[in-house]
UniProtKB/Swiss-Prot annotation:
Record family assignment: Belongs to the protein kinase superfamily. Ser/Thr protein kinase family.
Membrane topology: Lipid-anchor
Keywords: ATP-binding, Cell membrane, Kinase, Lipoprotein, Membrane, Myristate, Nucleotide-binding, Serine/threonine-protein kinase, Transferase
Catalyzed reactions per annotation: L-seryl-[protein] + ATP = O-phospho-L-seryl-[protein] + ADP + H(+); L-threonyl-[protein] + ATP = O-phospho-L-threonyl-[protein] + ADP + H(+)
Domain of life from the UniProt record: Eukaryota
Lipidation residue positions, type N-myristoyl glycine: G2
Major place of residence: membrane
Designated name of the protein: Serine/threonine-protein kinase BSK11
Function: Probable serine/threonine kinase that acts as a positive regulator of brassinosteroid (BR) signaling downstream of the receptor kinase BRI1.
Processing after translation: Phosphorylated by BRI1, ASK7/BIN2 and ASK9/BIL2.
Residue ranges annotated for the Protein kinase domain, each copy included: 75-332
Molecular function terms, GO-annotated: ATP binding; protein serine kinase activity; protein serine/threonine kinase activity
Length: 507
């Protein structure tokens, strides 16, 4: 995917209606049909199944959002990017008779926004925006002391995770260029729509949708400010003119974009003070991310470096306009037909997966977080064995006692993360054959994953399924093992089946 030219959407006036618990029983969000097109892009890539189904901007009641986030449960927190104000973002799910929609809810403090009318006015202005490059704002709440914003939910984490804290693979050069282009397009669209000041542009503000396409968070426009005097800007990302006068101007956004480009080049966050010094020394080789060595055109990197240096010019009048930045970055785009999720090394999420609220075990498997998966399996104990445990030869009490002791020894090793020892004890338990336990197979599968034996892990997960045919955990473990075996499509299919089974159990 990619685009050579951009045609930006003009903002539409959206109706503002308060959503209460009663409304959800019969209300389904109506899609806003808008003519956003990129002439040289695959229109499905980056847009997602839900772009045409973005609901109209609405005012939500506090009770609806509390229900959606399980009373703002700490386990629902999906973002804790630091700021000078509370900056917690929660994942939530709004349910009606016919619909389920995942949302993100940002919680502000009343002290930051003492005037609810000003909060509502700012939120409505941002809520009028609709664009494929944005994480669109779909509602707000300023009931009582609450100051809440509601946006689309992006399931594939932030640029901070993919650029700075990656596990499997570094972000390739072509994807970094795509991120730069899409963010610039989002900024230009909003500039043309009258919102010219984006605050604290950084990698935390860029999120990836179900297609793996980068989008700019709408929360960056929501600041308690007047005439450019912003009261809560993070000084780590601010331009020199703000430090001098306390005022932001449209050119300040270009400066922030320059620091953003340096992050993409280097693979690490460079504070603006260091960034300017690096630019002045013209030391591109030192700046470049060493993980990209030999995997990028040096001339293209030099052009991005030069563009960043112009964005970081001390004189705001000497900085390029966002439209000019787009023109330069567009010429550098590569792999136009390769989907973003492929370049990120993740699986594409389908509509089914986006509609269903995710469990902790789903998130752990989707993110290949073995440590979290281990904690979940340990917490499950043997609750699922009640319907499948076969106590053959119950008269052999001593044998039963012995086999239970063996299992307990395996459990102790599993709990203490002595996975090879746990494998030995669980194997003894299975070979005795007096008790049949899907949980033991699941735990041994988990141990094999930690010991880098995905084939054995897959066999045990399949055996757990044979014992307990509709147990979601068995499917989740198969998904992880298949991913470890680089069977990406099979893993995605298995993850989807696990999600369906889990949803059936919860309904």
């Amino acid at each position: 995917m990619g685009c050579c030219q951009s045609s930006f959407l003009k903002p539409s006036s959206l109706h503002d209606k308060k959503i209460t618990s009663d409304d959800l029983s019969g209300r389904r969000g109506k899609g806003a049909k808008r003519g956003n097109r990129h002439r040289h892009a695959n229109i499905n890539e980056g847009r997602g199944w839900h772009f045409s189904d973005v609901p109209d901007f609405s005012e939500f009641s506090a009770s609806v959002l509390r229900d959606a986030t399980n009373n703002f449960n700490k386990n629902a927190v999906v973002s804790v990017c630091s700021d000078q104000e509370p900056n917690l973002v929660y994942q939530g799910c709004i349910r009606s008779d016919k619909d389920k929609r995942l949302i993100a809810v940002k919680k502000f403090s009343k002290t930051t926004w003492p005037d609810p009318k000003q909060f509502a006015t700012e939120a409505r202005a941002i809520g009028s925006l609709r664009h494929v490059r944005l994480v669109n704002l779909i509602g707000y709440c300023c009931e009582g002391d609450e100051r809440l914003l509601v946006s689309e939910y992006m399931p594939n984490e932030s640029l901070t995770k993919h650029l700075f804290h990656w596990e499997k693979q570094t972000m390739e050069w072509a994807m970094r260029l795509r991120v730069a282009l899409y963010v610039a397009e989002a900024l230009e669209y909003c500039r043309q729509s009258g919102l010219k000041l984006y605050h604290d542009l950084n990698t935390c503000r860029v999120l990836f949708d179900e297609n793996g396409s980068p989008r700019l968070s709408c929360f960056g426009w929501m600041k308690n400010s007047k005439d450019g005097k912003n009261f809560s800007t993070n000084l780590a990302y601010t331009p020199p003119e703000y430090l001098r006068s306390g005022t932001l101007i449209p050119e300040s956004v270009v400066f922030s974009f320059g620091t953003f480009l340096l992050d993409l080049l280097s693979g690490k966050h460079i504070p603006p003070s260091h960034a300017v010094g690096t630019i002045q020394k013209q030391n591109l080789n030192v700046l470049m991310d060493s993980h990209l060595e030999g995997n990028y055109p040096e001339e293209d990197a030099a052009m991005v470096f030069d563009l960043a240096s112009k964005c970081l010019h001390n004189n705001p009048n000497e900085r390029p306009e966002i439209g000019d930045i787009i023109s330069v970055i567009t010429t550098l785009q590569q792999k136009l037909d390769v989907p973003s999720y492929t370049m990120l090394g993740i699986s594409k999420l389908e509509k089914l997966e986006m509609e269903h609220p995710k469990s902790l075990i789903y998130d752990a498997c989707h993110q290949m977080d073995l440590a979290a998966l281990h904690q979940i399996l340990e917490a499950m104990e043997y609750k699922e064995d009640e319907v499948t445990c076969e106590l053959s030869f119950q008269q052999w009490a001593q044998q039963i006692k012995d086999v239970c002791n063996t299992r307990q020894q395996g459990d102790s090793a599993f709990r203490n993360k002595h996975f090879e020892s746990a494998i030995d004890k669980y194997t003894q338990f299975i070979e005795i054959g007096i008790m049949i336990s899907p949980t033991v197979y699941a735990r041994r599968s988990m141990c094999y994953l930690f010991c880098d034996q995905p084939d054995a892990a897959l066999r045990d997960a399949m055996q757990a399924q044979c014992v307990y045919s509709d147990w979601p955990t068995a499917f989740y473990l198969q998904a992880v093992a298949l991913s470890k075996l680089n069977m990406v499509e099979d893993s995605a299919t298995m993850l989807k089946e696990a999600l369906i089974l889990e949803d059936k159990r919860g309904s």
